[in-house]
C-alpha cells in the first residue's frame, strides 16, 4: 500500500515538472560575473552623432603645465572644502603634502587612494604616505591592492563642489618640468559620478558601463571601445598629443586613417616611439624633447576633446584604472588647438 502511495506521489511530481505552465528560476551564485558579461555586450554609443547627442556640454578650465607658479592656485582649489578624495598613481609633491596635512588638522576629511606597486618603483609612496600621516587626524590612505586592475593610474581630485581630472601625477615634475593638462570643473553630475566611482573603487566593487556618465571614459570598462570608435569615426582630422603609442589596434586604425584625413601627432622624444613605422609620412608625427611630454590629449574633428590619464598602450586600455573626460566646449577646444600648434612648431619632425 505504501509503495503504491509513493509511486503515485512520484508520478504527480514528474507530471508537475513536465507541465509547460511551470517555470523555474535558478539563482545565479555569481551574479557579478553575469552582470559583467551582459555589460560587456553593451555599447556606449552607436555612432559619432549618437555620442555628440548623449554627452553633456561641460564648462571648466584647462591648465597647461609646466607652470611652477600654478602650484599656489592648485593648493587654493583644495582649501575651501570639507572633503577631499584623491585617486592617483603618485603623490610626492612636498607643498601638496604639507597643505593636505594642514587642511586635515583643521578638520577637512581627506581620503587618498594610490598605487601600491608602481612600475619601476624606486620608493613605495603608499607606505611613505602612511608613515608621514600616521599621526595626522582626518587623513586615510588606501592602496589599490584590493582592486581587480593592474595599476591605479587614474588622476582625479574631488572636492565638495568641483573636481580635477588630469594627465599628471601630484609630483614636482608636473608643475616644473612636464607638458601636462589639468581640467577643473564644477559640473555637479560629473562630480557626483566621479565620487560614486571613487567609492566603488575604494570598496573593491566592480564597475560597469551603466555606472558611467556619458562624458566619462574609464579603463578598463569602456575606454577601448570609446577610443577605437572615436578614432575610426573621425571624418576630417585627428590631433594627438601624448607620451607614446604602442597599442597595435590603435596603431592600425591611425595608420588607416592617415591616408584619409588630416592626422597630426606629437609624442615624447623617447625610445618608446622610435619603432613607429615610416609610413606615417608627410610630417604627421613630431617628437617633443622639452618640456617632457607626459600629457594624454586627443582631438577628433575639432569637436570632441579627450583629456585624462590614459596612455595609448594595451596595458592602459585593458588592465589599468584610467579616467578620461570628453569635452565639447568650443572655447576649450580652441585653447587646445592653439597650444597644440605651438608645441608642434617646436617639436622635431620624425
Label for each model-derived stretch:
Residues 1-13:
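N-terminal Sec-pathway targeting helices
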Residues 13-23:
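Hydrophobic alpha-helical membrane-insertion segments, chiefly the h-region
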Residues 21-82, 90-232, 248, 252, ...:
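HKD-type phospholipase D/PLD-like phosphodiesterase module
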Residues 228, 239-246:
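Long, repeat-rich segments with strong aromatic
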Residues 327, 331-350:
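Amphipathic alpha-helical interface segments
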Amino acid at each position: 500500500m505504501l509503495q503504491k502511495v509513493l509511486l503515485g506521489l512520484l508520478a504527480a511530481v514528474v507530471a508537475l515538472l513536465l507541465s509547460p505552465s511551470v517555470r523555474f528560476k535558478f539563482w545565479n551564485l555569481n551574479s557579478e560575473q553575469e552582470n559583467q558579461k551582459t555589460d560587456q555586450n553593451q555599447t556606449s554609443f552607436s555612432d559619432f552623432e549618437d555620442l555628440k547627442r548623449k554627452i553633456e556640454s561641460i564648462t571648466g578650465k584647462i591648465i597647461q603645465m609646466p607652470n611652477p607658479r600654478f602650484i599656489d592656485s592648485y593648493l587654493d582649489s583644495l582649501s575651501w572644502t570639507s572633503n577631499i578624495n584623491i585617486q592617483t598613481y603618485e603623490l610626492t609633491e612636498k607643498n601638496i603634502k604639507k597643505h593636505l596635512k594642514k587642511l586635515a588638522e583643521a578638520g577637512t576629511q581627506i581620503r587618498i587612494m594610490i598605487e601600491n606597486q608602481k612600475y619601476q618603483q624606486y620608493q613605495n609612496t603608499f607606505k611613505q604616505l602612511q608613515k608621514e600621516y600616521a599621526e595626522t587626524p582626518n587623513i586615510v590612505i588606501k592602496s589599490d591592492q584590493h582592486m581587480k586592475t593592474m595599476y591605479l593610474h587614474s588622476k582625479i581630485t574631488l572636492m565638495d563642489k568641483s573636481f580635477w581630472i588630469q594627465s599628471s601625477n601630484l609630483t614636482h615634475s608636473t608643475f616644473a618640468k612636464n607638458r601636462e593638462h589639468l581640467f577643473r570643473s564644477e559640473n555637479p553630475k560629473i562630480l557626483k559620478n566621479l565620487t560614486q566611482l571613487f567609492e566603488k573603487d575604494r570598496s573593491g566593487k566592480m564597475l560597469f558601463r551603466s555606472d558611467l556618465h556619458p562624458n566619462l571614459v574609464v579603463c578598463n570598462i569602456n575606454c577601448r571601445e570609446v577610443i577605437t570608435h572615436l578614432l575610426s569615426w573621425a571624418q576630417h582630422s585627428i590631433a594627438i598629443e601624448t607620451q607614446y603609442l604602442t597599442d597595435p589596434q590603435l596603431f592600425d586604425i591611425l595608420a588607416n586613417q592617415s591616408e584619409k584625413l588630416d592626422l597630426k601627432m606629437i609624442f615624447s622624444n623617447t625610445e618608446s616611439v622610435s619603432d613607429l613605422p615610416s609610413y606615417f609620412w608627410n610630417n604627421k608625427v613630431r617628437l617633443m624633447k622639452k618640456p617632457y611630454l607626459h600629457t594624454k590629449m586627443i582631438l577628433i574633428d575639432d569637436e570632441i576633446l579627450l583629456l585624462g590619464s590614459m596612455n595609448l598602450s594595451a596595458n592602459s586600455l585593458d588592465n589599468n584604472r584610467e579616467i578620461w573626460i570628453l569635452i565639447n566646449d568650443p572655447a576649450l577646444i580652441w585653447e587646445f588647438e592653439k597650444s597644440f600648434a605651438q608645441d608642434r612648431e617646436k617639436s622635431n619632425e620624425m
